[in-house]
């Protein structure tokens, strides 16, 4: 019973860290990346549709993103959606493709992005700690029900704490790497 709680908590912590990594991918670090557009929804024939489903997105240069819509009539809608998403990007439309030049980040913008990274890191750590708390509660219920002994409870609780420390260290490492990437000029 206790092993199941351990396994479950491990999986949930892993998912929390993976979600954090995906979230960080959308933070612009001065280099062009198609993941910046992951959350952009285009009003396509009345239905909100992700840009990635409507166009081929390529990165021909380090600071340039090219969006080639499958349906040329949707080019205006895609451009509007990118502007509306307020990503600090200025798309230019030549009728067949949309080009987005990524300007070099200012020192102030870099600091703002580092703050965002730290905020996301804190949210990920909270998620990991919540998993720890829930798992410890589950273990206490098992002990109360007589399914595990008090010694087992202590051992499993220590194991969960070790896992928590491991995943929080992972979040810190990911955050440190992203901050370094952002602060590179």
From Swiss-Prot:
Classification via SUPFAM superfamilies: Ribosome recycling factor, RRF (SSF55194)
Location relative to the cell: Cytoplasm
Alphabetically ordered keywords of this record: Cytoplasm, Protein biosynthesis
InterPro entries: Ribosome_recyc_fac (IPR002661), Ribosome_recyc_fac_dom (IPR023584), RRF_sf (IPR036191)
Gene3D superfamilies: 3.30.1360.40, Ribosome-recycling factor
One function term, GO molecular function aspect: ribosomal large subunit binding
GO CC list: cytoplasm
GO terms, biological process: translational termination
Domain of life: Bacteria
Main location: cytoplasm
NCBIfam families: frr
Record-linked HAMAP family: RRF
Function comment: Responsible for the release of ribosomes from messenger RNA at the termination of protein biosynthesis. May increase the efficiency of translation by recycling ribosomes from one round of translation to another.
Name of protein: Ribosome-recycling factor
């Amino acid at each position: 019973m206790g092993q199941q709680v351990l396994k479950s908590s491990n999986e949930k912590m892993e998912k929390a860290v993976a979600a954090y990594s995906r979230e960080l991918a959308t933070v612009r670090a001065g280099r062009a990346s198609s993941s910046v557009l992951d959350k952009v929804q285009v009003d396509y024939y009345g239905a909100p549709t992700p840009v990635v489903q409507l166009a081929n997105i390529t990165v021909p240069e380090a600071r340039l993103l090219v969006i080639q819509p499958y349906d040329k009539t949707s080019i205006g809608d895609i451009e509007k959606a990118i502007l509306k998403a307020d990503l600090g990007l200025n798309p230019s439309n030549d009728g067949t493709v949309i080009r987005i030049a990524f300007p070099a980040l200012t020192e102030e913008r870099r600091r703002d992005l580092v703050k965002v990274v730290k905020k996301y890191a804190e949210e990920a750590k909270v998620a990991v700690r919540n998993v720890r708390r829930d798992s410890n509660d589950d273990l206490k219920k098992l002990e109360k029900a007589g399914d595990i002994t008090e010694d087992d409870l202590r051992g499993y609780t220590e194991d969960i704490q070790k896992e928590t420390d491991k995943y929080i260290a992972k979040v810190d490492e990911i955050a440190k790497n992203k901050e370094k990437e952002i602060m590179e000029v």
